[in-house]
């Protein structure tokens, strides 16, 4: 079975970008809550 590298990269980006964005937002909000 042949693995399409571009497909793997596309899926990785599709998964990593939103999760990292959510992670950053979560850390930001939790840090702000700690300051209060």
Swiss-Prot record:
Enumerate the UniProt keywords alphabetically: Chloroplast, Membrane, Photosynthesis, Photosystem II, Plastid, Reaction center, Thylakoid, Transmembrane, Transmembrane helix
Q: Where is it located? A: Plastid, Chloroplast thylakoid membrane
Q: What are its GO cellular component terms?
A: chloroplast thylakoid membrane; photosystem II
Q: What is this protein called?
A: Photosystem II reaction center protein M
Family, according to the entry, reads as follows: Belongs to the PsbM family.
An example GO BP is: photosynthesis, light reaction
> What is its biological role?
One of the components of the core complex of photosystem II (PSII). PSII is a light-driven water:plastoquinone oxidoreductase that uses light energy to abstract electrons from H(2)O, generating O(2) and a proton gradient subsequently used for ATP formation. It consists of a core antenna complex that captures photons, and an electron transfer chain that converts photonic excitation into a charge separation. This subunit is found at the monomer-monomer interface.
Question: InterPro entries from the xrefs?
Answer: PSII_PsbM (IPR007826), PSII_PsbM_sf (IPR037269)
User: Which Pfam family, just one, is annotated for this protein?
Assistant: PsbM
Report membrane topology.
Single-pass membrane protein
PANTHER family linked to this entry = PHOTOSYSTEM II REACTION CENTER PROTEIN M (PTHR35774:SF1)
Q: What is the lineage of its organism?
A: Eukaryota, Sar, Rhizaria, Cercozoa, Chlorarachniophyceae
Query: Can you tell me where the transmembrane regions are?
Result: 5-25
Relate the assembly described in the record.
PSII is composed of 1 copy each of membrane proteins PsbA, PsbB, PsbC, PsbD, PsbE, PsbF, PsbH, PsbI, PsbJ, PsbK, PsbL, PsbM, PsbT, PsbY, PsbZ, Psb30/Ycf12, at least 3 peripheral proteins of the oxygen-evolving complex and a large number of cofactors. It forms dimeric complexes.
Family matches, as SUPFAM superfamilies: Photosystem II reaction center protein M, PsbM
Where do the coiled-coil regions begin and end? none
Cross-referenced HAMAP family, in alphabetical order? PSII_PsbM
């Amino acid at each position: 079975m042949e693995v399409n590298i571009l497909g793997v990269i596309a899926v990785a980006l599709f998964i990593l970008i939103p999760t990292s964005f959510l992670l950053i937002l979560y850390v930001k909000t939790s840090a702000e809550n700690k300051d209060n």
